[in-house]
């Protein structure tokens, strides 16, 4: 039995780093045990288990747990280029000249002063440039290198008349019989591996080492054969024994053995074998462009790439875990978890045996001993089977889970810190489910509709201590995301708390109060009513008194919003409202945490029990009568009529908003006197046009929601006070008023989140369902075959209570039943992984800074928190900030993503990915208005309109009413003009409304032609643009106050005439698209309102927000960025814009314009706004840390693997293993191996994967180093007294100090001085207090000690550690201490004074310089503090020639 329990010994060592490299031929020979010379040796028994012999012929093992397998090697007949280096070799060959092997530069013209170069380096010699490239971009098909003639150079030769290449153009390539050059193009050659070696032969080795660091692995003369265990896919058991089935790699290995083809074929087979490696199979694609053309889908490994990294290398498996469904149990305490007895018996807890727990542990093992007659314990490093009598102290016993044990509970996904809670076990007689108090659902973000909880049973003492001290529920009462309370009242408790305070007739007698007092932690107060009535002499208590029994004595709390006042634990006042009871800012639980944090859990648990019992006594149920809201038929009728009126009013508001759009203003002028019978058709037209435009739909939805709030308010007007739905809604415990309105009153607005091919009719009736002209039929108009896009929009007037007709049911299904976030359901998880990838290793260091464990890089100088810095030292602050934002992203999934509303989730994604360098089609700029506009009435409104009018592009086509081409030749002109003249008619009313003139239009067209004439690509000289009040072609049109603008083409010559089609198809579209006002690059300008916290603050503005303009521009403009172009456009209106607050919304562009500090501020403001839109509140320190982690290198990087890799590259802390855990492990490992990178495993994820402890948090390691110097303690010293007496002294200023100033006390000066200063606490002490502690005698002893030290050493001899420490401290009292210390003190020595034969102390600085000083000046500085009246006495005694001066003494040193 002991043999069965024997465990394998694991090698012990300290892992410091891992190195990556490409194996060379020597490495493969050393790790192989067999040279494969025949195809059948690929599955040889010497390559490990499993094999046909069932025994490993190398190590003799028969168990796969002992034998992990052995490698073999296949030697090739000739060397080939390692396929991994083909890309680097091609890049290196492109840098050098193939003829002279020098670094290739631009070809130049030979002159007398220039040295002679080879024909490939010289211009105009007929030898064009060439380019080397691999045969394909895919890594697994790079079997060779191709060289091609540069097409641009070849075209230049053809223009000079040289049609063919010189005969010796390819002479730099040695002849290779394996390549038939006759079938190749004359401008292209396939280079064999032998030819590559020949080209690399003459290149400078330094250049090769720079581009190919692992050059010794370039040649591939052998290939490794993996052990059998990595290639066996199936074991089939037959009558004659087991039959092994190997994977596709085994077949390819056999094809490599004894291969006799050319190098290109051999390289192709090597790449085919690499394709089937587990690590590289992540690039296998099911598409047509698969990396391996010979691949079969059935041969693709199932566990591949990133999944292999996560499941095999990063996945940690344990037998001490469980997962099951959770149910609610309010009888459990908040920190308890109910575990079924059947599950508890199967979970084991390790515990060391000692005298205190021996009896308890032996008793717990009685059932086991009755069944098995023996028990297993771990004694030392071995598992042994023993009897009870053989137990020894120190044995590790494995017992079943018991009451009082601690387990770690978690509900995936763990998106925030508090989803991991250590809870106390309580064994329950249940089956298959765990039980949880409903109040604890909030931190787990779960409920009881089938959610599962994961449990982890700690085994080590360290793990148990960490659970109790770090993640226990009583240690997580404050939510680290928003700084408020983590727990709050549950649904039933919250409803009861609201009712017990709101109900005016809530009175309780003595029996009821005594019954409820059993659940309250504090005493029963005196009754509020001594005698209720003559018939009832029993005293009465109010509901407020009942609820006040939950507050401890001395508790004071106010909540002005609900008029709540609590004084000394007594609830004095309260008005209708439940905000102070909910999980909001300033609630009573948050105040209880500040009053007495240790009692909060008990108070919340007592409140739940008491309030649930009171609600059970009172009763609360929901019936169909609650849905009717009204108590009688007439009230219900009135409610229905008001709902109908409210919906009509909301529709009118939408129509008015639609008429305010500029494109609909003509409708008011034309239809202002329409007949009444046409109004119905106009409303139908409004509805139809609204659904065809996303802008109009967005405007209508916003206006309808604003007007619809009045309809929702009818629920409170007509609903009874006893309505259970309204009670729960007011209490905030269940549902919302919107759902109640949909069920009881009307469903209301229904709009689709995506565009559809059909629309909704204005009235959702059965007649509209059957109408052939309804928008439901799709296309409308003459061309019924065209497909139009709609944004469906409709209003359902019925409710679920009254029922829906078929069309209303269809509309509701189309709009509401669609999965609004199905396309972005994985987005929060992606953001969470990326944020955690960036911030996982950021922690609070012990010096108060925030650092990254990679290279100990500084992220923040101080962490901006309200609490003391010591409380967060060692914490993983980056993970906390990442979790805070991740939770906000997950909460945004509940908000729909549609065309009509901005998605908070996508907005948050765009803010976090601001560092991406991907080209953006559009960029936005924020322009804030200048303060001087406030001096005018409505100055900001008029100013914003004027800026918009100046910037927004107004195309020529928008003001032109008629365009035509007239044939009117002119023969009397000096310049040749085209006979085709373009006429454009413009109404003067339009010009006036657009604030334009005919002259300004002509000027704008001329400017646009001069700046954009290259876009025309027409053979013309110029355009003659004029304006006139009469038109030769249509005089009747000019009578309506129209202006005619003519455009005539100036021909290059009289013989060249521009064709009519060129004018019609090219010139006229160009002119109509030209802007006559605004900028060509500006797409649109929106006037928006922003709340004050989201906008840069303006001095002296008391408003809650302000107007600003959002300018949308088309991408980047080459050398000129969008911001520069906008500045030039705004030159005429510079004074109207506050340029100190205006900025580009693109963070990278903002940083390039204003610097990284301004970009950081804008990023934090945008991030705060995006988080606020999700409905979550996050502490500002989390937002600042996210901004600093992304911009720690001086610029914002992309939130992806490339951005993280760039940070590691800038900080010179490569971490390929950590990056491989995030994405593309094969590419990460391959790149690191080709560069020979060493990974120091500084991160947390790589440290844990390799069995190390992360270097922060509770895993922060330190070592005690013994100094080789002798400290000189002759008698035993109490280490605690010694450590408490050692103080750190700050550098003092040489300026005189008053009695109110503070200084730092002396440190360990001398043994005689130590007894007097040990009582100091190391903090700043007033000088007046120092004088009461130290005396002149202490100063004399200090002077004598320094004199003794000075004369105890030889000249130029360094002081020992103790004396050096004393002199360093005293040096701080020197009046010129800063100048004496300089860059820093390396040591103190005794030197000969420069001013005589006496000795003095000399500072040895860290830069190698020396500076002497007099210790008398230092003692005199101490005298000035302790005994200023003794200064003249000390000077006369020790400083013979010293005289007191302002700021110091005249003694030389």
UniProtKB/Swiss-Prot annotation:
Residues involved in Mg(2+) binding: 447, 449, 451
Keywords: DNA-directed RNA polymerase, Magnesium, Metal-binding, Nucleotidyltransferase, Nucleus, Transcription, Transcription regulation, Transferase, Zinc
Leading EC class: transferase
Span list, region Bridging helix: 806-818
Residues annotated to bind Zn(2+) 1: 56, 59, 67, 70
Single annotated GO MF: DNA-directed RNA polymerase activity
GO BP term, pick one: siRNA-mediated long-distance post-transcriptional gene silencing
Loss of function: phenotype: Blocked in the perpetuation of CNN, CG and CNG methylation in repeated endogenous DNA accompanied by a reduction in long 24-26 nt siRNAs. Transient loss of post-transcriptional gene silencing (PTGS) in young leaves. Reduction of heterochromatin association into chromocenters, coincident with losses in cytosine methylation at pericentromeric 5S gene clusters and AtSN1 retroelements. Altered cell-to-cell movement of siRNAs beyond the vasculature. Release of transposon silencing. Not impaired RNA-directed DNA methylation-dependent (RdDM) silencing.
Taxonomy, superkingdom: Eukaryota
Predominant cellular place of this UniProt entry's protein: nucleus
CDD domains linked to this entry: RNAP_IV_NRPD1_C (cd02737), RNAP_IV_RPD1_N (cd10506)
Subunit structure as annotated in this protein's UniProt entry: Component of the RNA polymerase IV complex. Interacts with NRPD2, NRPD3, NRPD3B, NRPD4, NRPD5, NRPD5B, NRPD6A, NRPD7, NRPD7B, NRPD9A, NRPD9B, NRPD10, NRPD11, NRPD12, RDR2, RDM4, CLSY1, CLSY2, CLSY3, CLSY4 and SHH1.
Family: Belongs to the RNA polymerase beta' chain family.
Protein name: DNA-directed RNA polymerase IV subunit 1
Organism expressing this protein natively: Arabidopsis thaliana (Mouse-ear cress)
Taxonomy of the source species: Eukaryota, Viridiplantae, Streptophyta, Embryophyta, Tracheophyta
The encoding gene: NRPD1
């Amino acid at each position: 039995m002991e043999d069965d329990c024997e465990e394998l010994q694991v090698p012990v060592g300290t892992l410091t780093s891992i190195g990556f490299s490409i194996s060379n031929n020597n490495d493969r020979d050393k790790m192989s045990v067999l040279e494969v010379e025949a195809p059948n040796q690929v599955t040889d028994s010497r390559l490990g288990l499993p094999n046909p012999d069932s025994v490993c012929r190398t190590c003799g093992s028969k168990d796969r747990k002992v034998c992990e397998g052995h490698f073999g090697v296949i030697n090739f007949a000739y060397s080939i280029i390692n396929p991994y280096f083909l890309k680097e070799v091609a890049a290196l060959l492109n840098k050098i000249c193939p003829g002279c092997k020098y670094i290739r530069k631009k070809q130049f013209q030979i002159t007398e002063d220039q040295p002679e170069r080879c024909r490939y380096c010289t211009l105009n010699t007929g030898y064009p440039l060439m380019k080397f490239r691999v045969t394909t971009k895919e890594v697994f098909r790079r079997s060779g290198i191709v060289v091609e003639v540069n097409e641009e150079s070849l075209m230049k030769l053809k223009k000079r008349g040289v049609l063919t290449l010189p005969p010796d153009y390819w002479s730099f390539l040695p002849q290779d019989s394996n390549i038939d050059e006759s079938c190749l193009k004359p401008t292209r050659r396939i280079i064999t591996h032998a030819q590559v070696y020949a080209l690399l032969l003459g290149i400078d080795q330094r250049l090769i080492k720079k581009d190919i660091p692992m050059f010794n692995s370039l040649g591939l003369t052998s290939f490794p054969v993996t052990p059998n265990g990595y290639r066996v896919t199936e074991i089939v058991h037959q009558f004659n024994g087991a039959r092994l089935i190997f994977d596709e790699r085994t077949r390819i290995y056999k094809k490599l053995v004894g291969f006799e083809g050319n190098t290109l074929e051999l390289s192709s087979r090597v790449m085919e074998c690499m394709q089937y490696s587990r690590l590289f199979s992540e690039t296998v694609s099911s598409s047509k462009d698969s990396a391996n053309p010979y691949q079969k889908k059935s041969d693709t490994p199932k566990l591949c790439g990133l999944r292999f990294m996560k499941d095999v290398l990063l996945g940690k498996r344990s037998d001490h875990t469980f997962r099951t469904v959770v149910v609610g149990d309010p009888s459990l305490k908040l920190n308890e978890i109910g575990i079924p007895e059947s599950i508890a018996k199967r979970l084991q807890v390790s515990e060391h045996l000692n005298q205190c727990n021996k009896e308890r542990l032996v008793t717990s093992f009685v059932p086991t001993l009755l069944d098995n007659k023996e028990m297993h314990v771990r004694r030392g490093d071995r598992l042994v089977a023993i009897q009870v009598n053989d137990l020894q102290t120190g044995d590790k016993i494995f017992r079943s889970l018991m009451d009082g044990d601690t387990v770690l509970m978690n509900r995936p996904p763990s998106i925030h810190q508090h989803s991991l809670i250590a809870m106390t076990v309580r064994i329950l007689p249940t089956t298959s489910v765990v039980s949880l108090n409903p109040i604890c659902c909030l931190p787990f973000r779960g409920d009881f509709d089938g959610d599962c909880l994961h449990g982890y049973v700690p085994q080590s003492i360290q793990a148990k201590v960490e659970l109790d001290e770090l993640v226990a529920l009583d240690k997580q009462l404050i939510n680290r995301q928003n700084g408020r309370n983590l727990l709050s009242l549950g649904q039933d408790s919250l409803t009861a708390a609201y009712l017990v305070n709101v109900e005016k007739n809530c009175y309780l007698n003595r029996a009821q109060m005594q019954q409820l007092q059993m659940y309250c932690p504090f005493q029963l107060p005196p009754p509020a009513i001594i005698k209720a009535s003559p018939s009832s002499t029993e005293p009465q208590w109010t509901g407020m008194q009942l609820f006040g029994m939950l507050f401890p004595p001395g508790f004071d709390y106010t909540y002005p919003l609900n008029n709540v006042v609590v004084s000394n634990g007594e609830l004095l006042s309260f008005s209708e409202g439940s905000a102070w009871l909910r999980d909001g800012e300033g609630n009573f639980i948050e105040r209880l945490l500040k009053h007495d944090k240790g009692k909060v859990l008990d108070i919340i648990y007592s409140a739940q029990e008491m309030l649930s019992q009171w609600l059970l006594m009172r009763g609360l149920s929901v019936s169909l009568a609650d849905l009717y809201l009204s108590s009688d038929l007439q009230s219900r009728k009135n409610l229905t009529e008001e709902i109908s009126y409210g919906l009509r009013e909301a529709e009118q508001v939408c129509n008015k908003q639609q008429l305010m759009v500029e494109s609909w203003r003509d409708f008011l002028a034309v239809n202002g006197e329409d007949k009444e019978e046409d109004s119905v058709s106009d409303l139908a037209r409004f509805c139809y046009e609204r659904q065809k435009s996303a802008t109009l739909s967005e405007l209508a939805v916003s206006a309808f929601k604003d007007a619809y709030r009045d309809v929702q308010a009818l629920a409170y007007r007509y609903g009874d006070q006893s309505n259970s739905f309204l009670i729960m809604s007011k209490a905030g415990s269940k549902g919302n008023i919107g759902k109640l309105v949909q069920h009881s009153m009307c469903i209301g607005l229904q709009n689709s989140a995506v565009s559809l091919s059909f629309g909704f009719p204005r009235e959702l009736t059965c007649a509209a369902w059957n109408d052939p002209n309804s928008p439901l039929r799709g296309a409308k108009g003459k061309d019924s075959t065209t497909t139009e896009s709609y944004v469906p929009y409709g209003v359902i007037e019925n409710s679920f209570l009254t029922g829906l007709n078929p069309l209303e049911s269809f509309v509701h299904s189309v709009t509401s039943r669609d999965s609004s976030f199905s396309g972005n359901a994985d987005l929060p998880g992606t953001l969470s992984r990326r944020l955690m990838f960036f911030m996982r290793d950021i922690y609070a260091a012990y010096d108060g800074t925030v650092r990254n464990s990679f290279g100990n890089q500084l992220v923040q100088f101080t962490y901006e928190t309200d609490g003391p810095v010591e409380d967060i030292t060692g914490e993983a602050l980056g993970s906390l900030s990442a979790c805070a934002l991740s939770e906000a992203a997950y909460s945004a999934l509940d908000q729909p993503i549609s065309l009509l509303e901005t998605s908070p989730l996508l907005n948050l994604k765009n803010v976090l990915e601001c560092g991406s360098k991907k080209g953006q089609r559009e960029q936005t700029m924020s322009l804030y208005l200048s303060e001087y506009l406030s001096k005018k009435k409505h100055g900001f409104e008029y100013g914003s309109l004027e800026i918009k009018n100046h910037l927004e592009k107004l195309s020529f086509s928008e003001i032109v009413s008629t365009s035509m081409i007239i044939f009117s030749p002119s023969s009397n002109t000096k310049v040749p003009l085209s006979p085709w003249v373009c006429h454009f008619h413009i109404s003067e009313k339009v010009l006036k409304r657009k604030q334009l003139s005919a002259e300004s239009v002509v000027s704008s067209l001329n400017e646009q032609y001069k700046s954009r004439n290259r876009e025309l690509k027409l053979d013309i000289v110029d355009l003659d643009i004029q304006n006139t009040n009469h038109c030769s072609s249509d005089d009747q049109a000019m009578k309506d106050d129209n202006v005619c603008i003519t455009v005539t083409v100036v021909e290059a010559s009289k013989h060249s005439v521009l064709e009519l089609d060129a004018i019609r198809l090219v010139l006229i579209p160009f002119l109509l698209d030209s802007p006559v006002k605004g900028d060509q690059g500006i797409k649109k300008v929106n006037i928006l309102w922003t709340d004050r916290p989201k906008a840069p603050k303006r001095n002296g503005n008391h408003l809650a927000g302000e107007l600003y303009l959002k300018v949308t521009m088309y991408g980047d403009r080459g050398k000129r960025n969008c911001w520069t172009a906008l500045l030039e456009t705004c030159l005429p209106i510079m004074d109207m814009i506050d340029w100190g607050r205006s900025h580009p919304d693109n963070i990278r562009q903002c940083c390039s314009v204003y610097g990284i500090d301004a970009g950081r501020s804008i990023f934090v403001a945008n991030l705060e706004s995006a988080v606020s839109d999700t409905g979550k509140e996050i502490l500002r320190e989390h937002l600042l840390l996210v901004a600093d982690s992304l911009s720690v290198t001086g610029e914002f990087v992309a939130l992806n693997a490339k951005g993280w890799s760039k940070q590691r590259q800038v900080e010179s802390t490569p971490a390929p293993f950590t990056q491989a855990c995030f994405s593309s492990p094969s590419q990460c490992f391959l790149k690191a191996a080709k560069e020979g990178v060493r990974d120091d495993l500084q991160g947390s994820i790589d440290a844990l994967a390799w069995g190390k402890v992360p270097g922060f948090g509770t895993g922060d390691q330190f070592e005690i180093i013994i100094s080789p110097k002798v400290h000189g303690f002759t008698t035993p010293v109490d280490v605690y007294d010694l450590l408490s007496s050692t103080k750190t002294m700050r550098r003092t200023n040489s300026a005189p100090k008053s009695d109110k100033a503070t200084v730092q006390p002396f440190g360990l000066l001398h043994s005689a001085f130590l007894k007097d200063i040990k009582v100091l606490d190391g903090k700043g002490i007033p000088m007046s207090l120092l004088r009461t502690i130290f005396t002149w005698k202490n100063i004399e002893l200090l002077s004598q000690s320094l004199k003794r030290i000075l004369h105890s050493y030889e000249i130029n001899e360094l002081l020992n550690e103790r004396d050096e420490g004393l002199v360093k401290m005293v040096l701080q009292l020197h009046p010129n201490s800063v100048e004496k210390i300089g860059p820093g003190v390396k040591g103190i020595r005794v030197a000969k004074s420069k001013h005589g034969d006496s000795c003095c102390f000399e500072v040895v600085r860290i830069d190698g310089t020396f500076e002497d000083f007099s210790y008398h000046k230092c003692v005199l500085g101490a005298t000035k503090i302790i005994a200023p009246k003794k200064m003249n006495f000390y000077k006369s005694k020790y400083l013979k020639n010293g005289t007191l001066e302002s700021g110091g003494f005249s003694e030389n040193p």
